[in-house]
Amino acid sequence: MPDYLLSINNQVLLCYFISKNSVSKSKGDKEMKSKKYGMMLAVLAAAGGVSVSAAPVPVYELKGLTVTATRQAETTKDVPANVQIVTEKEIKDRNVQNAAQAVALATGVHVDTTVEGSVNLRGYNSKNILVLVDGQQMNTAWNSTVDWNMIPVENIRKVEVVSGGQSALYGGRAVGGFINNMTKSAKENGVHGAVNLGYGSHNTVKQSYMASGRKDRLNWGIFYESKITDGWRSYLSSYAIKNSKGKNNFTGVDTSSLDTTADGKEYIIGDRGKKEVMSESYGFNLGYDFTEDRKLTYKFTHSNYTWKYTDPRSYLSAGFSKPSGVPASTFFGNRGWRVYDMHSLTYNDQKDKIHAHFGMTDYTKSGYITPDKTVKASRTFDGAGSKTSYPSKSWDFDLNKRWTAGSHTILFGGSYGKDRFDETIYKTVSDWKSWDSTVKGNKDDQWLGGKAKSWALYIQDKWKLSSRWAAYIGGRYDYYEKYGGYNYYRGKAPTRLESDSYHQFSPKLSASYALDNHTNLYLSFGKSFAPPLLYQLYRYAEPSYGGRYEPNPSLKPETTTNWELGIKKDMGKTKISADLFYARTKDYIDLVTIGKTAKGADIKTYKNVGEARTHGAELSVTHKFSSLWSVYANYTWQLGKVADADNGYAMGRDYEIPRHLFHSGVTYTNHPWTVNVDSMFVSARNEPGWKSGKFKSRDAYFLLNMDTAYAVNKNLSVQFSIYNILDREYYDQESASDKYYAGDGRTFTLSARYSF
């Protein structure tokens, strides 16, 4: 049993996705809708879950090993970076429901409380965080986002989270850090398996089944995981009070009961309804051990994800018909589909210290359908719509080798990657609720896309200067090319967009100093190279809410300089870690308004706007009072500034980054019981003049949560969790987009695990 627990950041986000007494955010009213738990009782009678041990494993183990941070096995305390490990045991003990919540257990991570659960690390979203599964990139080729619900959390063995710029070893997407999700494989002969079943008051059902086995040199595994939820009314419908000419859009409409958005420019006229989500993943792995040191492993995952809004509501006395000109999608939202296949082939030779990986992530289906003006409430919301599809595909290959020469451990490697996407926009399809709906040819139907490829060489020398000093000296040379961009309308000749190439050397220099056996100091400096995303280069879109997004194939890569200074201290029952970090980005890419449409809506595109800066400090403290009680607290202060295109490109605050994050909690462990009570505070991020407590605000909020686990026996356990015990109401913005949402209220989840 481990004696100490280090801070577990964002534990409070563990159970929002499961059951709930739903809280409507419509007009301040609350609709308490009770749910039946008969299914869960049947589940408990028939099955169960993995056994719960006497104490949770620490998220960040000073004696733990990381194989990701420096591409070689090292103890986390010796690595000159903020490295954290989330273990399989902790994922189970904390009743984690999706991969984003697993990452949220790490210090410095902020996960929004939407169904998707976007991740923010030190002010960076997934566009600048490299996310891997068994070394295979999960960031989409289309826009670098990560579908966290499509990563099967029950199949995760551990998660390694490395904060700060890591481009010298991992390339352009690792500007803010990287996250590697490592999945399970059988270690011992025989067959093993697990079942996890859960139910909640959102009518949420989660189920996972897995089995693995080994026979001498051959190992295998299979898994299936799914999650279905009715969701809550997270997205409110709003419409501009005045049009572009200053005319009131609500003339003759009773607005006395309507609330406004945070900026006061729009009325809240309804909500899109509950957001129903279905995620499903299944796959297998095969491994063969040529010897104890030489292994070949193939892993395959197929994942399917869909969402839709149901039961939209209007807050207007005239229902969905007024004011005139409001697009149907304002009330009804859209429906989305995503399907991907992931292939991963890895060869690992511990004897000769050779590692090779080849992978492909293929989003065969990705897009959405938006209802058009023919969709009406009187016709059960049936009708036509417009369809946008943007499948994408990524390939990558990496090969490296290590040598040891005296006090030097040298790593040398190379990588190659290729991305592509193809977007199709059909202006009219017969049924907006069906992906396979009949396309009605329209002269404005559009096809566009593009490609990018890169290759790189990297080197790192770990130089053990003395028993106390170690230096890491290295760098990476990247060559990047964007090409094959095209754009054409139905019946028109294609327009070829410009191609270009860039190259960059990204150095990295770090030093670690052991003051004594219990205290380590480290200092790190590095540069990062981040090429523009394909959708920033080549995407064209006309959203249902108006306006237009135009491509910009002239974008240049961003370059970022990173500094970090930190300390890790073990004082027996108390552990302390602290760090300071700074990042400065040149040629920062941001979305800017470049004009107006004929109807006065914004025309936007991505541009290199200038500079962006982020700096901050992190402090984490844990203390163990006894074998039964332990506590933790951690605090993050961070500030982001960016060139503001609407203010003459002067530096201004980046309001998407919360300045203050605070987490604390207490754990009680007395076998067979384990109880965790956690809290989280996120500071407000509203722009000047914006009001809190309204839709489209980024509120400050405090959440209190509890998780209880009971081990029935060594194979069976039962868990019960409450998220947002105080039933706080708040509004926020998704971490990886410009979408706003109403936070979920009090949530309950009951689950059972059984292993064999």
What positions do the PLM features span?
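C-terminal beta-signal and adjacent terminal beta-strands/loops
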Residues: 15-17, 235-236, 529, 584-586, ...
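N-terminal periplasmic accessory domains that precede
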Residues: 97-102, 117-120, 132, 147-152, ...
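Short acidic/polar hinge/loop motifs at secondary-structure boundaries
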Residues: 137-164
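Transmembrane beta-barrel wall of Gram-negative outer-membrane proteins
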Residues: 199-228, 236-308, 339-346, 404
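Face-selective signature of the C-terminal outer-membrane beta-barrel domain
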Residues: 287-304, 334-489, 512-514, 569-570, ...
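Structural signature of Gram-negative outer-membrane beta-barrels, strongest in the C-terminal barrel
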Residues: 291, 407-411, 415, 448-584, ...
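Membrane-embedded beta-barrel scaffold of Gram-negative outer-membrane proteins
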Residues: 348-369, 512-514, 520-526, 554-615, ...
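Gram-negative outer-membrane beta-barrel transporters
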Residues: 464-471, 581-585, 601-690, 711-717, ...
